């Protein structure tokens, strides 16, 4: 542009700048259209795959009821919270599915909307419970908790999840929107080009780093009620705690992901046999790291911690962490700095009537 200023008169310089600006906007628009087309293509391929599976099972006449062993009649739902190491964990499930003989399915919602419409809730519940060809199944996606019992389902799925320190999660998400990660480095992100650091955003009172953006893990566990998404709702916090204890099989934390995987392998070997060793030996390939991430200053953290929203999200995180550590303490023993799963610690006796 310096050369243009020397060679061109002012009017032509202005025209050149305008043309350049229009060209940039045009290119950004074309890139956005390509991304939308790619998303539509992915959804079309997924629908085609589903139809192919259904056609294979109806080609020879009416669909036969598939009798499943009790061990195979299991569905796990991992309603993953964004930026909690969810991709790292899900990749392990994909790597193990062929070996351990189960199916992995991604729940791809339009624009990553975590709240399903009522009609989609009905469809989803019906799919998950009646799609026997996909059992045992591991479903994952950015979807808030859905209570299957309200739809009259006899056998509910097993819910699992992972959560993260709320400020660390927000910082990671902030930079992810701008710079992406090492998983798909070439993909253009929504905020790409915005070089403002998280500290600068907080200091300026920006919307992308506002305390309201912390409100995510609570509504994901609270569910599909309107009050769950009312930022700062004490009812939503208590409902999220209730669901975590009563509706989730296990909830881990990002900071102790290996222990979470170890407990799942011990309790649900049908799905997770070999997961701990895979995580340990393949750590570099499974971990997904946000690029260009800068840790926030103490001043930035202190400012966010003044928010009532942070206090509530942190209360939920501490509640989940305490519960996870309680479960772990009763499932493992430590020796020489290593954790080992406890053997079966109960047995049956005094069995009557006596067999002859």
From Swiss-Prot:
Residue ranges annotated as Cytoplasmic topological domain: 1-11
| Transmembrane segment boundaries | 12-28
Mutation effect (residue 94 to A): Preferentially transfers sulfates to IdoA units
Free-text tissue specificity from the UniProt record: Expressed in heart, limb, head and trunk. At stages 20 and 24, it is expressed in the most regions of the first and second pharyngeal arche. In both wing and leg buds, it is detected at the overlying ectoderm and mesenchyme throughout stages 21, 23 and 24.
Keywords, comma-separated and alphabetical: Coiled coil, Disulfide bond, Glycoprotein, Golgi apparatus, Membrane, Signal-anchor, Transferase, Transmembrane, Transmembrane helix
An example of a Gene Ontology cellular component annotation for this protein is: Golgi membrane
**Keyword Membrane carried by entry:** yes
Chain ranges sitting on the Lumenal side read 29-356
Gene3D superfamilies with a match to the protein in the record: P-loop containing nucleotide triphosphate hydrolases
Glycosylation (residues): 108, 127
What does changing residue 140 to A do?
Complete loss of activity
Any matching Pfam family:
Sulfotransfer_2
| Compartments, as annotated in UniProt | Golgi apparatus membrane
KW Transferase (keyword) present: yes
Where does it mainly reside?
A: Golgi
Please report the name of this protein according to its UniProt entry. Heparan sulfate 2-O-sulfotransferase 1
């Amino acid at each position: 542009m310096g050369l243009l200023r020397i060679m061109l008169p002012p009017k032509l310089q202005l025209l050149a700048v305008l043309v350049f600006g229009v060209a940039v906007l045009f290119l950004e628009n074309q890139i956005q259209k390509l991304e939308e087309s790619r998303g539509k293509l992915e959804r079309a391929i997924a629908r085609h795959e589903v139809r192919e599976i259904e056609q294979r099972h109806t080609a020879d006449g009416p669909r036969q009821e598939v009798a499943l062993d009790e061990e195979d009649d299991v569905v796990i739902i991992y309603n993953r919270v964004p930026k909690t190491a969810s991709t790292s964990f899900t990749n392990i499930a994909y790597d193990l599915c062929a070996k351990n003989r189960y199916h992995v399915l991604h729940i791809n919602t339009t624009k990553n909307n975590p709240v399903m419409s009522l009609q989609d809730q009905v469809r989803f519940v019906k799919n998950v419970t009646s799609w026997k060809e996909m059992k045992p199944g591991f479903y994952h996606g950015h979807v808030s908790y859905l209570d299957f019992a309200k739809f009259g389902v006899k056998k509910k799925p097993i819910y699992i999840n992972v959560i993260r320190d709320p400020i660390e999660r927000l910082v990671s998400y902030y930079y992810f929107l701008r710079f992406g990660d090492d998983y798909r480095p070439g993909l253009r992100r929504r905020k790409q080009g915005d070089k403002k650091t998280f500290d600068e955003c907080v200091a300026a009172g920006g919307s992308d780093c506002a305390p309201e953006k912390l409100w995510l893990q609570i509504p994901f566990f609270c569910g599909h009620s309107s009050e769950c998404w009312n930022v700062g709702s004490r009812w939503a916090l208590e409902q999220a705690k209730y669901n975590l204890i009563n509706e989730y099989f296990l909830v881990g934390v990002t900071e102790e992901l290996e222990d979470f995987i170890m407990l799942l392998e011990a309790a649900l070997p049908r799905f997770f046999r070999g997961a701990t060793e895979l995580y340990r030996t393949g750590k570099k390939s499974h971990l997904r790291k946000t690029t260009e991430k800068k840790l926030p200053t103490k001043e930035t953290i202190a400012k966010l911690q003044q928010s009532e929203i942070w206090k509530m999200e942190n209360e939920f995180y501490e509640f989940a962490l305490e519960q996870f550590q309680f479960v772990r303490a009763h499932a493992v023993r430590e020796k020489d700095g290593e954790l080992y799963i406890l053997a079966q610690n109960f047995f049956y006796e005094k069995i009557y009537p006596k067999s002859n």
